């Protein structure tokens, strides 16, 4: 018989020849066989094996956490790249809208503000544009400009953080804003209905529709001097296009409800205009000989 002191044979298990021995006895002495030879492990060996197992478990857990962090970072970067591709695809169909000028001004501002925080950077972006898709586009431009400036590596890291944060918090809002921009831009060229309210109204209709009363209130608030009938038609066309490309049953139902409500508003507007026209004629006293009271 061979007696082992503080020895380990890797992952090879020892078969206990006396399974009836209580665990308290095994702590002091364990009998078994290894490669056909009887062996005896005395107390110190078991503790050594336990310590090694604990160390291996800790190292594995630490590596697993690092791997998970890297995977999360990789997933975040992939989401940023996906959103960037969509934003570029849509916004390339319209003029730059002062994009290059804004990026240049922000780059100058950041260069002179080495200790700027993430919240301050977001505030600067909002000062340049209230549209999330344009803010995201500016960040992408800043990131590309900073890549060639090794002395501003800390600012590059901050901008990349801001991109990840924006995608995590506003991915749908960014993509929807970019997607509707070409149509909203064309509609705004008449000079009657502003670009940003058009984007906001469309985005709200898709992301958080609150019913016919809410959308009517929004239209009156956002377009006090605009052509509301034209805005309703703009929304109907945009949402109908979304409906044709939508596969999900629940999403289709939501869009159908909004489109139906817009049609009701359109009809209401038509009746309302007729009533106003009739009342104007009546008040002027030229309607079939009737006179105002």
UniProtKB/Swiss-Prot annotation:
- Predominant location: membrane
Q: What induces it?
A: Temperature seems to play the major role in regulation of transcription of the yopN-containing operon of pYV, whereas Ca(2+) concentration has only a moderate effect at 37 degrees C., and no effect at room temperature.
Which InterPro entries does the record cross-reference, listed alphabetically? HrpJ-like, T3SS_LcrE
Superkingdom of the source species = Bacteria
Which compartments does it reside in? Answer: Cell outer membrane
Which keywords does this chain's UniProt record carry? Calcium, Cell outer membrane, Membrane, Plasmid, Virulence
Q: Name one Pfam family in it.
A: HrpJ
Q: Name one GO biological process term.
A: protein secretion by the type III secretion system
User: Could you state one GO cellular component term attached to this entry?
Assistant: cell outer membrane
**Record's keyword annotation contains Membrane:** yes
Its biological function? Plays a major role in regulation of the low-calcium response. Seems to sense the calcium concentration and to transmit a signal to shut off yop transcription when the calcium concentration is high.
Q: NCBIfam families per the record?
A: LcrE
> Which family, according to the similarity comment?
Belongs to the HrpJ/YopN family.
Q: What is this protein called?
A: Outer membrane protein YopN
**From which source organism is this entry?**
Yersinia enterocolitica
* Native organism taxonomy: Bacteria, Pseudomonadati, Pseudomonadota, Gammaproteobacteria, Enterobacterales
